[in-house]
Each structure stands twice: as structure tokens, then as C-alpha cells.
A protein has these predicted regions:
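Cytoplasmic helix-loop-helix junction between adjacent transmembrane helices
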Residues: 100-138
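Juxtamembrane intracellular "pre-TM" segments in multi-pass secondary transporters
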Residues: 184-211
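Extracytoplasmic gate region of multi-pass secondary transporters
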Residues: 26, 207-252
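C-terminal transmembrane helical hairpin of 12-TM major facilitator-type secondary transporters
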Residues: 273-318
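Helix-to-loop junctions at the C-terminal end of transmembrane segments
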Residues: 57-69, 259-271, 357
Length: 393
């Protein structure tokens, strides 16, 4: 345990930082719009640039991780996000903002392939479920801190200061990781060293494709809840924004608790495919109840909290399922490819959900979430059911 804890803590800190830096920019949009005289659409395009580069380059980062190991790639990713955030903080116009966002997006692309290569390579099998659980929770913590941090400093000292302060946080984390880099060094697998070029054949196996589809469908459902849940609840039930927002917050809190509990559950079961199947099925049933309108308004926070808890349970097991589908020497590229599915699901569905709301079918948002969740259950049941044997990256 002593050798595992520093690795899990360091990688979790890096993951929290990546999520923190992803979300420091949007709360500053009103201040940036006023000072720079640009539209929200323009600022939205800058944010889109970040996520597109992150999604497209994530599989490529996985290939690099497999070839040289995760340590150098992770440190490089943190460095790029630091530089990108600092450049945005110093920028005086849209083009420098876009360049900073691009650098940050490139840096963000490395975290999932590098993190999971390191965790799989350094953490003992018995503690992997807990390691994946903490990894997921750390990302949520980064998301939770970012809006408070950037909005608070932005209101006090301006958006430039907020971004420069965020870059300083990244600098402190980079220093922490660099001075402890020996703790998470992982040698590239011999199979990856022997492979020439960028062999994508491993990504075309049905198991890996099923993992990608599972992540994409899960993200599609999550987008409906987090991005359109408040609007859908208001339109469908005519409730106040505060109650609708409280319900979504309850979902996130329940999800975080579920992630921690999921680590213990996954560590104690051999049929790891049943955990995400059961969790998503339970969440889907709650979404169906919401769509049909049988849940009273005052019970919405409790219903969303239960749904979030059920989904949170699935996070550690889904990462172990990806591990089970990964051949030796391909950890980086498989995790990079599969996690790109989250970005695809997030990009592909907002217009659809918006169309449902525009056409007066607010409950259709929850019917759609229900459908995406059931499709995700189908894909996860196609994956290896047993815990993977120990393999090194």
C-alpha cells in the first residue's frame, strides 16, 4: 500500500489539475466579452478549439505513451496546459486567446492515456479499482473548484489575474510532479517498442470499439443531464431555476459518492461487467420516471442524487473493463482512443437536445437520456466479464 498511495495521489493531483484548467475559462466569459468586445459565440469557438484538439490528439498521445512511457508525456501535458493558461491570462485579443486554448487543448489530450498507463503499470492489481475510483473523483474535484476559483478572483482582480493565478496553480503541480517523477516512472512495454509506426489494428477489435461506443453513449446521456437538465425540468414541470439547479447539483454529489463506493464494489466482484450494466440500468429507470412525470417536484433532488450515485458506481469498473480489452503494450493508445469517445458523445448531442427543447418536447430530453443509457448497457455487456490478469504497460 505504501508504494501505491504516492502514485495514486500524484496521478490524481495531475488529473484534478487538468479538469481544473479545463473549467477556469468559461466563468470568465462575461468579463472577457465586455473587455474584448467579442461575442459569446466567439468565446464558445475558442472553447470548442480546446476540446476538438484534445479529442483528436488523445489517441495519438496514446501511441506516444506506449512508445516512451507515461511519465514524460504527463509532464509535457501539464507544461503545455500551464503555458496555454498563462498565455490566455496575458492575452490582449482573440487570437492570442485562441493560441493559448490550442496549447491547453494539446496538453489536455495526454492525461487519460498517460494516467492509465501509469496506474496500470505501477499500482497493484488488488488496488486498481480504488485507484480508478480516486482518479475519477479527483477530476470531479477539479471541476468543482474551478468555477469558484476563477469567478472569485475574476470579480476581485479581473480575468487576466484569474487565469495567471490558475497558471500558477499548474506551475505548483508541475513542480510537485517533476520532483516526484521517479515514483510514477513506467517503462514502455516490449511489445510497444517492437511495434513499428502507428499500428491502429488493436483499436479496430470489437472489444475496443465496444468500449469506445460505451464511453460515447455514456457521455451522450450525461450531456443531456448536465447541460440541458435544468432547462428541461423548467420547461416540463414549470419549476424554479433554483430547484432545477439543486437537482443537478444533487446528481453530481451523488455521482462523486458513487465513484468512491464503486471502488470498493468493483474490488469485491469478479463480474465487473455487471456493475456498469446494473448502475446504468438503475439510472435509466429513474430517467424514464422523470420523463413520464411521475416524480414529484420536491422529490427531484433525491431522484437525481440516486441516479448520480448509480452512475458513479460504474466508473471504476468501466476502467477495468477497458483494461481487460487492452492487449499488452497498447494501454496508452487504447485508453486514448476509448476516452476520446467521451468527447465525441459530448460534441454529437447538444444540437439534438436543443432541438427537443425548441420543439416543446422537454420530457424528450429524459427519454433520450434513457435511450442512450440502455444502448450503453448493451455495449458494456459485450465486453470481457472477468477481472483482467495483471499486465504491465
Amino acid at each position: 500500500m505504501k508504494s501505491d498511495l504516492p502514485v495514486i495521489s500524484l496521478i490524481g493531483t495531475g488529473h484534478a489539475t487538468s479538469h481544473f484548467l479545463q473549467l477556469v475559462l468559461p466563468p470568465l466569459f462575461p468579463l472577457m466579452r465586455e473587455e474584448l468586445g467579442v461575442s459569446y459565440a466567439t468565446l464558445g469557438l475558442i472553447l470548442t478549439l480546446f476540446y476538438v484538439l484534445s479529442a483528436v490528439l488523445q489517441p495519438l498521445a496514446g501511441f506516444v505513451v506506449d512508445r516512451i512511457g507515461g511519465r514524460a508525456v504527463l509532464l509535457g501535458g501539464v507544461s503545455l496546459m500551464l503555458l496555454g493558461t498563462l498565455l490566455m491570462g496575458l492575452s490582449q485579443g482573440v487570437w492570442s486567446l485562441a493560441l493559448g486554448a490550442a496549447l491547453s487543448g494539446i496538453g489536455n489530450s495526454v492525461f487519460h492515456p498517460a494516467d492509465f498507463a501509469i496506474l496500470n503499470g505501477r499500482v497493484t492489481r488488488e488496488r486498481l479499482a480504488h485507484a480508478f475510483s480516486i482518479h475519477s473523483v479527483s477530476g470531479s474535484v477539479g471541476f468543482a473548484i474551478a468555477p469558484i476559483f476563477s469567478a472569485g478572483i475574476g470579480a476581485w482582480m479581473g480575468w487576466h489575474a484569474a487565469l495567471i493565478a490558475a497558471a500558477a496553480v499548474a506551475g505548483a503541480v508541475l513542480l510537485l510532479l517533476a520532483t516526484n517523477a521517479g515514483r510514477f516512472a513506467v517503462e514502455a512495454h516490449p511489445a510497444a517498442k517492437k511495434a513499428g509506426g502507428f499500428d491502429v489494428s488493436v483499436l479496430l477489435s470489437w472489444q475496443v470499439v465496444a468500449c469506445f461506443l460505451f464511453f460515447a453513449l455514456h457521455a451522450a446521456a450525461l450531456t443531456g443531464i448536465l447541460s440541458f437538465g435544468v432547462s428541461a425540468l423548467k420547461e416540463q414541470l414549470g419549476i424554479a431555476t433554483t430547484l432545477a439547479s439543486t437537482a443537478i447539483t444533487a446528481y453530481m454529489v451523488g455521482s462523486g459518492i458513487g465513484m468512491l463506493a464503486g471502488g470498493f464494489l468493483t474490488a469485491r466482484t469478479s463480474r465487473i461487467d455487471l456493475v456498469p450494466a446494473a448502475g446504468l440500468s438503475a439510472s435509466a429507470c429513474i430517467m424514464l420516471a422523470l420523463a413520464t412525470g411521475v416524480v414529484p417536484a420536491l422529490a427531484l433532488p433525491a431522484a437525481f442524487a440516486l441516479s448520480g450515485f448509480a452512475v458513479g458506481l460504474t466508473y471504476p469498473s468501466r476502467d477495468l473493463l477497458v483494461r481487460a480489452a487492452t492487449p499488452p503494450g497498447a494501454t496508452g493508445r487504447v485508453y486514448g482512443f476509448v476516452y476520446a469517445g467521451l468527447d465525441v458523445g459530448s460534441f454529437a448531442t447538444p444540437v439534438f437536445y436543443g432541438w427537443l427543447l425548441d420543439h416543446g418536447t422537454a420530457n424528450g430530453v429524459f427519454y433520450a437520456v434513457f435511450g442512450f443509457a440502455l444502448l450503453a448497457v448493451f455495449t458494456v455487456l459485450q465486453l470481457p466479464a472477468r477481472k483482467p490478469a495483471i499486465q504491465r504497460t
